C-alpha cells in the first residue's frame, strides 16, 4: 500500500533507556535487568505457544545463556546490533554493490518519480504512472495526472453496510470488515472501475490537498463514522425497520461521508479547461473537457483491455480467483485474478518491457529491502550471518501463516538479462526522488520469485489461453485472504 503503512504486526518495539550521557550511566544495571526480563518474556511466550503453557525453568535458560556466551561471534553480534539499526549492521555490501542501475532492456519513455507521501495510494500512483506515458508520448508533455479525483471517488464508493446486517457482529467476516471499512488502498480492477465511471484529470486542475497526501486522519474520521453508521443500521434492522427506512437512513449517512471527504480533498471538477505547451513549444488548449473525455480522448488508454495475473502457489494455476466483498463500485467489474506460475509471470513481464510497455505490479515491499538505497534483494540483509538462522518457509507457507501478503504497488520499466535470463529489474516507485536512483529501485530476480504476487498486462500481450481463463466462474477467496490485502 505504501511507504508508511505496514500490513503485518509483530512484537511492539520497546524503547529502553540508553547510556547517552554520564547522568544515565548509573542506570545501566537497571537496563540490563530490563533487557533480561524482556528476553525471558519473549522466550516464555514462545515456549507457551509451543508447549501448551509449560514455562521454561531457570536451568534451561542458563543452558541457553552458557551456549550463547561460548560463541565469540554472538558477543560481537550483540555489541554491534544492540547499538544500531540491525539492517544497517547486517547490510551485505557485496550485494549492494552488485545491484546496479544498469539494464539491458528498458522502456524508452519514463516519467519523473512521484510521491504518494503519507498515504496508501500506491495502487493509484502506480496506475497513473502507467497512464501518463501515452500522454507524454502523444502530446509531448510531462503533465502529471490527478490522483485525488480517483482517491475521493474510491473512498465514496467502497461502502455497503446494509447487505450484512443479519451477519453475527462477532463473526470473523464482520470483525474483519469493521477492522478497515474504508481505506485509501485498492486493486487494479478498482482502477478500471474508477476510470470507466469517472475518468481522470490533469493534476493542474485538481491538485493534491494536504489530506490526500496525509490520509491517516481522514481515514480515521471516515472509519469512525462508518462503524457508527453500521451499528445504527444494525440496530434499526433489529428493531424491524423496513429496508426502505434503512436505505433512506443510509443515504443521509452517505451525505455526511461526502461532506467529510469534500471538505478534506475538495470536490473534483465536472468540467475543466486544459492548456499547455509541449516540449517543442507548441501551444494547445482544450475547453469544456469532462474527466471521462480526458481519459478517453487525451489519455486514450484502454484499461478495460487489461487484466490481472497473480502468483499464488497455495492454489492451482490457470484458474480464476476473486476475493469476497472486495470491490469499489456497484455494477463495476469484480476483482479477478488469473493464477500463473512465477516463471510464466516473469516471461510475460519481460515480453511487455521489450515491447516498450510498463508493467503495474503488486508485491510485499517491506521484505529484504532498503528503501533509502532503493534495493530489493533477498541477499541484502544478512540475518544468517548476524543471528545464525535461516528462513525456510516457502512462498505458499508464508501466505498461509500470515508472514507475507501484498503491501505495495509499483511499476516495472526495465530488466537486465544475461543469456536471456533475468538478473535484476528496474522499478518505478512512488516514494519521491530522493531514494534509489532518482526514485527508481533495483530488484534482484530472486526477490521477484519470493515477494512479487501480481502483474497487469494488456490482453493482447498475453497468451490466449490465459485470457480465456477470464471466462471461468471465479473461485472465491475469503475477504481476509492475503490476495486482497493491497486494498485494505
Language-model regions, residue ranges each:
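N-terminal regions that are enriched for targeting/export leaders
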Residues: 28-111
Amino acid at each position: 500500500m505504501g511507504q508508511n503503512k505496514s500490513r503485518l504486526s509483530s512484537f511492539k518495539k520497546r524503547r529502553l533507556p540508553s547510556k547517552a550521557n554520564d547522568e544515565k550511566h548509573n542506570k545501566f544495571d537497571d537496563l540490563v535487568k530490563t533487557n533480561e526480563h524482556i528476553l525471558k518474556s519473549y522466550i516464555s511466550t514462545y515456549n507457551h505457544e509451543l508447549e501448551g503453557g509449560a514455562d521454561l525453568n531457570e536451568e534451561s535458560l542458563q543452558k541457553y545463556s552458557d551456549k550463547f556466551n561460548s560463541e565469540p561471534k554472538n558477543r560481537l553480534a550483540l555489541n554491534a546490533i544492540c547499538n544500531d539499526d540491525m539492517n544497517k549492521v547486517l547490510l551485505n555490501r557485496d550485494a549492494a554493490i552488485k545491484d546496479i542501475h544498469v539494464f539491458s532492456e528498458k522502456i524508452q519513455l519514463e516519467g519523473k518519480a512521484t510521491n504518494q507521501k503519507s498515504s496508501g495510494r500506491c495502487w493509484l500512483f502506480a496506475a497513473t504512472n502507467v497512464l501518463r506515458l501515452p500522454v507524454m508520448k502523444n502530446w509531448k508533455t510531462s503533465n502529471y495526472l490527478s490522483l485525488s479525483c480517483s482517491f475521493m471517488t474510491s473512498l465514496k464508493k467502497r461502502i455497503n453496510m446494509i447487505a450484512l446486517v443479519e451477519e453475527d457482529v462477532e463473526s470473523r467476516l464482520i470483525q474483519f470488515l469493521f477492522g478497515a471499512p474504508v481505506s485509501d488502498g485498492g486493486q487494479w480492477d478498482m482502477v478500471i472501475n474508477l476510470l470507466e465511471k469517472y475518468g481522470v484529470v490533469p493534476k493542474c486542475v485538481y491538485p493534491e490537498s494536504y489530506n490526500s497526501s496525509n490520509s491517516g486522519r481522514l481515514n480515521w474520521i471516515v472509519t469512525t463514522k462508518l462503524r457508527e453508521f453500521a451499528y445504527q443500521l444494525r440496530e434499526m434492522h433489529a428493531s424491524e425497520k423496513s429496508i426502505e427506512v434503512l436505505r433512506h437512513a443510509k443515504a443521509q449517512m452517505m451525505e455526511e461521508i461526502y461532506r467529510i471527504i469534500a471538505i478534506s480533498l475538495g470536490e473534483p471538477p465536472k468540467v475543466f479547461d486544459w492548456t499547455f505547451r509541449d516540449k517543442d513549444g507548441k501551444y494547445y488548449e482544450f475547453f469544456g473537457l469532462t474527466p471521462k473525455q480526458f481519459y478517453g480522448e487525451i489519455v486514450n488508454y484502454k484499461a478495460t483491455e487489461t487484466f490481472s495475473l497473480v502468483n499464488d502457489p497455495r492454489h492451482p494455476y490457470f484458474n480464476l480467483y476473486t476475493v469476497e466483498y472486495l470491490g469499489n463500485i456497484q455494477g463495476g467489474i469484480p476483482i479477478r485474478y488469473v493464477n500463473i506460475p512465477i516463471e510464466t509471470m516473469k516471461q510475460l513481464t519481460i515480453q511487455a518491457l521489450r515491447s516498450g510497455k510498463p508493467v503495474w505490479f503488486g508485491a510485499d515491499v517491506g521484505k529484504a529491502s532498503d528503501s533509502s538505497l532503493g534495493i530489493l534483494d533477498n541477499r541484502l540483509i544478512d540475518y544468517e550471518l548476524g543471528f545464525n538462522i535461516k528462513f525456510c518457509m516457502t512462498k505458499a507457507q508464508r501466505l498461509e501463516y500470515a508472514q507475507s501478503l501484498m503491501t505495495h504497488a509499483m511499476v516495472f520499466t526495465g530488466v537486465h538479462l544475461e543469456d536471456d535470463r533475468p538478473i535484476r529489474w528496474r522499478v518505478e516507485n512512488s516514494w519521491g526522488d530522493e531514494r534509489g536512483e532518482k526514485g527508481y529501485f533495483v530488484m534482484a530476480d530472486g526477490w521477484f520469485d519470493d515477494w512479487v504476487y501480481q502483474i497487469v498486462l494488456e490482453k493482447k500481450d498475453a497468451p490466449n489461453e490465459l485470457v480465456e481463463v477470464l471466462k471461468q466462474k471465479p473461485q472465491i477467496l475469503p475477504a481476509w485472504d492475503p490476495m486482497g490485502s493491497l486494498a485494505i
